[in-house]
Each structure stands twice: as C-alpha cells, then as structure tokens.
Amino acid sequence: MGLLGMVGDSFGCSATGERLVSAARDGDIQEAMALLELNPRLARYSTFGIRNSPLHYSAAKGHHEIVSLLIESGVDINLRNCRGQTALMQACLYGHWKVVQILVLFKANIHKKDCFSGATAIHFAALKGHTRCLRLLVADYVPSLPEFWSVMHAKCTDETNKEAFDAVALRRLINNKSDGGVTPLHLAALHGHAECVQLLLDLGASVSEVTINDGSTIDLIGSGSTPLHYAACGGSAVCCQLLVAAGANMRAQNTNGLTPLMVARSWHKSSVEGILTKRSEVPVRILPSSYLSLPLMSIVKIARECGWRKTSVSSVCHDPCAICLDTECTVSAEGCGHEFCTKCALYLCATASSSTSIRGVPGSIPCPLCRHTIVSFVRLTSTTPIKELPWTNKSLALCAAGASTGSKYAGPAAITSSKYAGSLHRRSEMRSLRSSSVDLGCSSFRTASSGKLSSIKLNCTGADETMPCLVNCFRPDVQRSSSYRERIRRYSQFS
C-alpha cells in the first residue's frame, strides 16, 4: 500500500500539473492563477518526454500575461526542455515579441545555447526573421547614444564616444557561433530576411565569418562559407546587395573551392548572378536599419527600476499618459520633453520604425505627438524606484497562501481562493489554504506560522533539482512524519 500510495500521489500531482500546462497553452489566465494559488510549485512542472514546462508552452503560444504570472510565481526563467531550449528561445522562434520583452525585463539569459545545434535566442530570431525580437534581445548592449551608428561603422572620430559603450561585447554577442560555425547573419542571409540582415550589420555582424566542419552538422553549401555564400544559396538579391555593400568578398572560396557565384549557379539562383558577377562601379550607400532602436536601453532600465505596470492617476495634479489616457506619466522623452507612462514608452521602442521619423539620428524613433526624434527617455522626478522587485519574493507570498496581505505589492497570483473555487472543485484544499497551516502538496512537510521564517527545500514534481522555498513555520524542529519514512523503507524493498 505504501508504493501504491506514492504512485497515487504522483498521478494526482501530474494531473494538476497537466491542467496548468493546458491553461498555459490555451491562455486561460484565470485557471492558471487559481492553480498556482493552490500549489505554486506547479510552475516548475514539466511534461514527460519533451519536458516542456508551462513557461515554455505559454511563451511558444505568445500568452505574455501567463508568462509574467509564472515568473512572478517563482519559476526559473531559464528553465530548459529536453532540447535545452529556454522559453526565450521558443518566443524568438515563433516571433512573440511581447513575450520576449517580458523575459528581457525579467533578465532572462540570452547567452544560453540549446543542446542540439548550439543556437542562442538570437539565432532563432534570425532564422525566422523576427526583427522586433532581435532588437529586444540586444536592449542591454545598444546604448541610448546618438553616436552609436557612427561608432559601429567607424565614422566617429571622437574617442570619448567610442569609450561610452562596449562595442566589442556587442560584436561578440552578434557574431556568436552555433554548431558548424554558423552565425545569426548566416541564417538570416540564407532565408532572405533582408531587414534582419540589415539590423545585424548595424549591430556589428561580420561578413567574413566562415563556417567550419566540426562533424556536428551537415553543410550542403560547404564548410568555409561566408554569409554571402549562404545568401547566394538562398537566392535573395537584396541580402546579397546588403552584404556586398558591407564589404563581403565576392571571390571568397569555401573548402569546396566554390565562390558565391558558383554556389548560386549550383542551386539555380539566377536572380543573384548579376549581382555576384562583378562589383558595381557605383558604391551602394549603407543606410541604417529602420529597426534600430536607441531609446530601448534607457526605458528598459527605468522599467526594471520603477516597474512597468499600470499605475492609475492618483490625483488631478498628475497628468495621464497622452497615449493610453489611463496611466500616470513616469518618463519623458529627451529633446521634446513629452511625457508618457513606462508601458507606452516600452511599446513605442519595441514597435516604432525609425523610417517614419524625420531626418535625424540613426536609430532614433519619432515622438507620436510632435514627430521629434527620441534618442533616450529619462525618469520623472516624481517617479520613485520600487523598493522590491515583484518577482523576488513571490514564492514566499504564494507558499504563505495569502499570509503576505501586508505587502505593498500584490501580484496577479495573489487572489482570493474563493473566487475560482467553483472551477476547481477542490474545496477541501481551499479550506486548508485559508487556515494558518499550509499543505505543501506532494511533500509530507507540515507547516504552520510563526514570527520567524525557516528555509526548507521542496522537491518539485517534474524538476530535476530542488528549489529552496520559504514558508511560515510554527515549530523550528520540522521533521518528516514516521509514515513517510515507513513508505520510503517499503519502497526501497521493491527496488
């Protein structure tokens, strides 16, 4: 009976975890809230086989509200599935820029690589040509400086501006190679994503990087190929023109002795043969990408320091945001001085195209009110930084099941249990949550509340590691029950 009891508990937790997975996949925010209120450790649940967590499913489907809810519930933002892919990679693969924006604000790791191809999130964004996702990924590396484009293209003579940011780190990030030496520029050029190629070139992508034969990939074009070889194979005339204008060598040969022109002929891409035959006598002018967004770094920093959620206008003395007309202004644009809320400013930086602005600084975005160019945002003096990030103690608030009512921050998961009790049909568990003792689900720990906090490790279903979680405890000498030890002893006899 001990073994059967443990199996029953496992199936019970799996069933509840599958409900959270379904809610994350379908975008049912209320169901996800209620399930996480009952058991916050379900955020780390993963399905069998592919081991996709609810965070992976919600990111792949573009449900940014559920992504934010899961992160605030204490889930590891860099959790991997069986392929080694994170939620950020999935969001970039399917082009959900709102999810990418939330993950970047929560400081997701953009340097992680998947286990099968060694690709990063930038590789996935370049593969599908999701330029908005790409510029959000480099938000912490592209400074809000008017001289950025000139410095990256070696047209700036002021040494002070060159030292204002780390251009080497940005180039290293953009030219990061996956298995086989493939860079994001290779992938964007192969699939004909011209806007993505132009943005990568503005960010310092190298046109001379070549692929290698490391035995991990099958390169049909041939190792030693440059991005121009890949563009010739893909047959994109615009990508070939951009690469040639950026200084790509049209006579470069790969290990098979093929030039880009030979590659184009072998793949029957006659549309690019004229571009690759001879260099044009009239040099092509390199224009800045319309997806380059300089103010993005400044507004991301402000959002992390002061929050980006809606804050209703507290009094008539504060003017609402001119865009949403619902939220108090928190930032102002340098130059024109127009004020916006942080959420609207983030939306402008993520979606605005610099091609619609007047002639000015490359990478600036137009002000929606006066069309003046915006290079950076500054925080208003009335905007105060938040004392505590909303995701730092959310696991404590959830495990306490409403014990943190005195907290200044109340996340979306901190809701009353009775609101969604009818949809869950778990009234017995709801009563236990309302009481002072907290049932930890699959674990046999029993806790109560006291003035001090005890740190214990909870083994999460579907996770490959333990996650420390703080819970309120009546007694400092919390121990496992004798029935639990008896079940473990009986279970060991079967193994």
Curated annotation (Swiss-Prot):
Reactions accelerated catalytically: S-ubiquitinyl-[E2 ubiquitin-conjugating enzyme]-L-cysteine + [acceptor protein]-L-lysine = [E2 ubiquitin-conjugating enzyme]-L-cysteine + N(6)-ubiquitinyl-[acceptor protein]-L-lysine
Keyword Transferase annotated: yes
A matching Pfam family: RING_XB3-XBAT31
Repeat found in the keyword field: yes
Pathway connected to this protein: Protein modification; protein ubiquitination
GO BP annotations listed: protein ubiquitination
GO molecular function: transferase activity; zinc ion binding
UniProt-recorded name of the protein: Probable E3 ubiquitin-protein ligase XBOS35
Annotated transmembrane regions: none
EC number(s) given by UniProt: 2.3.2.27
Keyword terms of this UniProt record: ANK repeat, Metal-binding, Repeat, Transferase, Ubl conjugation pathway, Zinc, Zinc-finger
Organism superkingdom: Eukaryota
ANK repeats mapped onto the chain: 50-79, 83-112, 117-147, 180-209, 223-252
ZnF (RING-type) ranges: 321-371
